[in-house]
Structure formats: C-alpha cells, structure tokens
Amino acid sequence: MTGHLPRLLSPFSPDRLPVMDAPVIEAQPRETGSKAAREIRNNDRVPCVLYGRTVESTPLQIPIAALNKLIYRRSAPVAEVEMNGDTWNCILKDYDLHPLTDRPLHADFQALEEGDEVTLTVPLNYTGIPVGQQNGGDTQQIARELTISVLPENIPAQIEVDIGELVIGDSLHVYDLETDYEIKTSRDQTLVTVVAPQIETAPTTEAEEEEEELTEEEIAEEGEAVDTEEGEPAEGEEAAGEGGADEEYQ
C-alpha cells in the first residue's frame, strides 16, 4: 500500500463456498464434430467437455441458460454436473463467447479431486467506504477478480477485501493481502486506489464571451478616437494657417 499508512491491513476474509452449495447442472451426452455442435447450439444448448485427473475426457452438452448463470454469477465458478446418474463436483475452467453476441459457444469443466489444488478465478468483493472517499476523494477499483490456487474444500465464494481505512493517496495491492492460499495474480497488481478529486474549471458562458468581445471592441474604438484628437488639427486652425501664409507672400 502506498501513502502514509504505516499499519498492515488484514483485509482478507473469505466466505467459504462448500461444493455442496454449488448449483446443479443437468447435462446430456453429445456427439463430437462441428455439425453436431451447430445442432446443439441451435437447440439453446452448449457443447462442453468434462475432464480431470481421474476422469476421462467426456463430451457433454448443457442448457445455455445454466452456463450463463455460472459465467455471470458473482461467486466462484463451482458447479455440480450430473449426467446419466453420475455427479461431478467441477469448476468452470474455460469458455468461449461469440465475438459479437457474447453467446456461449463452448465450455470446459474440470472435475475437482480430493487433495489436489485447483487454479481458478474468484471475484473480489470490496467492503467499507474509504476514509478518503468520505473526505471527497475518488475510489477507483482497478481489479475485479483474482486467480488463486486452493484445495477444493477451501474454495471461497468471493475474496472479501476491507478498504474502509484507505485515505486519499493510498493504494491497495495484491501483496497487501494476507491469505491462507496462493494467489497467482501478480503481487504488484493494484486492486484499489483513492485519488484526490479533480477540480473542474467553470466553463465560460456565451454571454461572458460576448461581453469580453464587446469590451475589446470598445477599447479599440476609444483608442482610435484619442489618436484622431491628438494627431489631426481642428478645421478652424487649418484654415487660419493657410490664410496667413498667403498674406505673407503677397
């Protein structure tokens, strides 16, 4: 953390998500190949693959709605996949989206193995209102999730981070977190920063601009009038001068 803070924050307080609380997804076997995949997608389902250390790679299909819920759920992507009477505790390891519609095209599920750590991405949940924000600062949340390596029984639903003590000028990084498992995200990754408010200059109104233009024009006109008065003789004086010269040379 940067700034004046000499203290060490302990912001990490994971909310455990037992695998038994994971959503259940009903899957069906599927054929492989591009033609079969297109037919599956046309029926609002997604072709998937399930694999694991002790699980043979298994092609399957699931409802697109079930996958969308898992993708956009604000918790660890853990699920129970059921097919033909078998159940696997899994994580959503990877998925592909259509580049234009964001429709899921394919997904990979990794079966969780007892005693084997698994690497997955878990959402961050920031709690508290920074002191700096209460004093007019702006809180910028840079990171929304972290990649961690953890045993299946210790997978957190979210990574809860307390940012209430941050003042203006403070930043929170991955290396500030105290965890009981390995964080794969770079230690130098900034999570949150609190910056001073931006002072905006009041925009000049059209009326003020017109008034300034008129004032400049008036000043210019007054200057021309002064030059005329000082540099040119009056009409009477010019006539008198001309007459005197004629009389002198007659």
Curated annotation (Swiss-Prot):
Keyword vocabulary terms for this entry: Ribonucleoprotein, Ribosomal protein, RNA-binding, rRNA-binding
Signal sequence interval, chain numbering: none
GO biological process: translation
Transmembrane spans: none
SUPFAM superfamilies: Ribosomal protein L25-like (SSF50715)
Pfam families: Ribosomal_L25p (PF01386), Ribosomal_TL5_C (PF14693)
Sequence similarity: Belongs to the bacterial ribosomal protein bL25 family. CTC subfamily.
Known partners and oligomeric status: Part of the 50S ribosomal subunit; part of the 5S rRNA/L5/L18/L25 subcomplex. Contacts the 5S rRNA. Binds to the 5S rRNA independently of L5 and L18.
Function: This is one of the proteins that binds to the 5S RNA in the ribosome where it forms part of the central protuberance.
Protein name per its UniProtKB record: Large ribosomal subunit protein bL25
Organism name: Salinibacter ruber (strain DSM 13855 / M31)
